[in-house]
């Protein structure tokens, strides 16, 4: 199983909206919701799970096995095993952003090397 992986690689200076996923008319559109159980403590997931915001002060969240705790990343769902998928990512003043795919076994407790 593979999931959409989003990582915020630099601080967002004034808070506010960092990422938002939207559906597209593309034939391979995939509706994605961010998984708050995987979100790094400095990432806040909106109630509708479509927006992520960087916050300066880390949230007090359980350090569950699914949570990224070193690299500011989170996973989107649902996962997939094959096929073509398309996402649109909107972001604000974030200087660095990485979007990709990750396996279930992605390292979450150590620094994540993005390739």
UniProtKB/Swiss-Prot annotation:
InterPro entries: B30.2/SPRY (IPR001870), B30.2/SPRY_sf (IPR043136), Butyrophylin_SPRY (IPR003879), ConA-like_dom_sf (IPR013320), PRY (IPR006574), TRIM/RBCC (IPR050143). It comes from the Eukaryota. Expressed by the venom gland. Keywords: Neurotoxin, Secreted, Signal, Toxin. The keyword RNA-binding does not apply. Gene3D superfamilies: 2.60.120.920. GO terms for cellular component: extracellular region. SUPFAM superfamilies: Concanavalin A-like lectins/glucanases. Residues 22-115 form the B30.2/SPRY domain. Residues 1-15 form the signal peptide. GO terms for molecular function: toxin activity. It holds the Pfam family PRY. It is found in: Secreted. Neurotoxin that produces dose-dependent hypolocomotion and hyperalgesia in mice. May directly act on the central nervous system, as it is 6500-fold more potent when administered intracerebroventricularly than intraperitoneal. Belongs to the ohanin/vespryn family. This is Vespryn. The lineage of its organism: Eukaryota, Metazoa, Chordata, Craniata, Vertebrata.
